[in-house]
């Protein structure tokens, strides 16, 4: 049953082949084997077109629609499962007929109608029927559980795939308002809920319904007069349960939506953990996360009374039905309208079984409710029709492309800010096979034009044409495959360098190439982008893992790999959005030469703030406020002395030295790649694939036993002691209902052995006792539902919050591990507290009920008659417990292994969606889809194998009570026949043991809950108890500036990253920086500049040597207080969910007046832009702030840093994303901000450091030159060559 489902044939258009939605390629990683079929754009589900037009699904309607997601084999399995479940549900009602016969036999023997020999013979004969029922039920339960589990696994796999596919095909406007970071939460949590709701729970529900119906059929055949009034309890119970389930579904949907939004915040936070740590923003972001949790808790608490009513009404009606059946049955018997006492008991026990079936059905309805809420979310996404469908087969596909692009009167506003025109009637021509450069201020619309050319958005009015054809008429995927794009902030996937570069090739081309050809193309592209040398320097070369979003490479290395990816397919159009912004001058010159070469034969659109990269362009277009204000060549624009001339002058870099006759030796221009790139080798070479590393990092699972975990949890949640205590007391009292039932039923059975004139009196009394028991149950189950649900949600809120705080409190080295990617951690933060909550809610009360009842009925049986009790108990419970134990062990092992594998697939999906612009520009949607399917294969195959074996034990534990009945009747009958027991003793023991066996069976129905909760509790407890060596340390107050003349001192500092301790990044660094000095760090990409900033922020501790701050060792200073004295502006800025105001205030703990916020923004040249927005400072930043341009984000980050008024200012390419004018203004603001504080700036754009008090030139982890700008120029060494490469004069 493990074969892959065959896809339903999708609707095809224009002769295109369909995308295989269920049979991904066998490639082990993204891109190794591309999909061989083109996406058709039609969702692969029955009646997809109709579904697309429907309104959002709600509750059970969404759950019902899940069942359309199946293949023919799944339909067959479900039909088999349905009939097997129905047949197994009839077993117990059929048993009541045999039970009625037993009662008549026992009564006949009790009044002396039959002899002992006849009694034993009839008992033995009828006991065999119980054995037959056991065998039949065992087989049927196994069949229905395995059938429904297999189809659930297969269907949810398909849902996961289609959910990812649906997200990937959405237009960019959707992502401006939707939080892509929540994909890990949604895909993990929702898929788990849906699978639970479609697995054996469906069979259990069908079994319960069949049991209910067949029980009443049996009851009606015995006596319709008695059954009819009692049957009125069923619609009453169903109505109440239906109402409460509907209310529960609405609350559950709201809770899931809030958790999804919280998951987006978590992913943003973990994905930019360095910014969070540097700014001490953990507390502020934790409060925002807590606000989400508080809202979810509010709805969760409202579920308390709903579930309380649901549980209590169900059991109250059930016990009232028992009372009514016996009371009215006695009346009918005395009136001669029913045959015998055995008939009454057959009807009574049929009703007992029928109403008890509601206890089987009700828990499954809760799972169906959760599955329906999750399905609502999933199906709404799957059925959403994108405005620009990247997978659509519609549109023209010209056979050739010349490359003429034209924008005619293009007007555009971003959907998130429709009142702000980003482009205002732009008219421009981009001629084929020419280089056209776009320059201008940040926010002038340059990158927006790139987005329109990629057709991420459509203009509000006007048109964009390619070779005279409106791009709206072209096939979206075809259009994007004609374009190579390198973005300002390049995104690489957590895979090998080889695979990342290979993504630039169209999937159908990859499928037709052999491995040798693919590697040849990849290497050639890397040679052209100046990436081959540093790649070859890695131990694993092109098979080096680059980390999440390429984080294990330096910025320049990422950029060069991205350039190689863009040119490998030799596209006719090349879009370069700040393509060389992250490169050092030497690498920039070489890469620029390569870009000049590859641009000669194609249409190239170049966006740049660094004007040295555009002066050779055929046409330079100057933009301002969404309009074209100048255009021409570099020379002609300089001659006009207009806006462009001003921009060039602002970037001029003096090459004149005070003493040109210096005889300082000139440094060689050559740099051995294997030395130059050791930094990258250290950071990026991970020889283990993600799931193998994950296995190493998760060796703490189940460090504590479940009992100890619960003790820790209850101790920590002692403030909710009253809720847990009242829920626990209610559970204990409810557990006593089972032995009470045993006593009452035994009294009822033996009532018919009394004189006839006592029947009415005894019948009234015992019926009244059942009603009293029903009132007790009403109170106790209401208490369980209310108190434990409220306590669970309150506890869950605490552990979600604490888990998040524990994660963001870890050192940066923790996040460097591939197993701890933001996607994986977000998925864990979603599933682990949820699993713990599921146990702490009413489930723990039900488990306690089962334990109490099992102990109570066993004690009652032993006290009543130890011989029969021992035989019955040991004949029933040991095999039951053995089967349950084996099943639990298997579930624990499967849960451990699958959790890691599903985390890896969730990480992969999250990374792809968070990089949606890169995915869409490379038309990787189908590749991501297929490789995501590959990552699902292992957990799916493992689950199928586990299901086939584990369900044997499930079936046995679910049906062994029938075999125990056979043993109890046979042996009990023999004891009675020899006069050792009377009928009352026998029935007390028999019913007690049967109820005990059923209770023991119920406890193993919670094994998956307890297994998941056990693992979750250990994860949470372990991480919370894990003290981070750096972030968790305490120390002394930071030294004052008066304690030392030297602000920062490096003494023989050497460093290697924890993931590669054998690869040194910094080697014996020695430098002194005095108070108030402005220092620049320059050098080739990967030389260790950013690593020094990381050490100064104390993201890591040095391997050897010391860093002194104001004369005091950095390791002796309290890390939190030290970081409060520093601000960091990094190369890739990060904004978070929330308003602009909240983002600027990130990490600031004091109350800041608006005037101070406004001044910081004015200093960063962003205030005017902010107040031009309709909502001003209250404008929502959106997911990662992507609705703002790169320059706008950078200026907001600069304002955020300035607001802290730090002693130390660390600038890591702080102005790299700014246009010339903004750079000039921000640079002036930074110059102003530097006064009175120590500043260390990392820069490739040397114009930003030429006025520094000291410049340190790094190479291969060592300082090779130092001095002022003029001093270094006089040496005509490494720095001089770098300056020369960036010269902007006409002769350069």
UniProtKB/Swiss-Prot annotation:
Q: List locations, semicolon-separated.
A: Cell membrane
Q: Which reaction does it catalyse?
A: itraconazole(in) + ATP + H2O = itraconazole(out) + ADP + phosphate + H(+)
Q: Which residues are glycosylated?
A: 149, 494, 820, 1009, 1031, 1052
Q: What are the GO cellular component annotations?
A: mitochondrial inner membrane; plasma membrane
Question: Which keywords fit this entry according to its UniProt record?
Answer: ATP-binding, Cell membrane, Glycoprotein, Membrane, Nucleotide-binding, Transmembrane, Transmembrane helix, Transport
Triggers of expression: Is slightly over-expressed in strain TIMM20092, and azole-resistant strain isolated in Switzerland.
A single GO molecular function, which one?
ABC-type oligopeptide transporter activity
Q: Where is the composition biased (Basic and acidic residues)?
A: 663-680
Top-level taxon of origin = Eukaryota
Indicate which residues the UniProt annotation says bind ATP: 440-447, 1083-1090
What is this protein's function per UniProt? Pleiotropic ABC efflux transporter involved in the modulation susceptibility to itraconazole.
* Name this protein carries in UniProt: ABC multidrug transporter MDR5
- Topology within the bilayer: Multi-pass membrane protein
Q: What parts of the sequence cross the membrane?
A: 79-99, 128-148, 202-222, 226-246, 314-334, 344-364, 720-740, 768-788, 844-864, 866-886, 949-969, 986-1006
Chain's gene name: MDR5
Report if keyword Disulfide bond is assigned. no
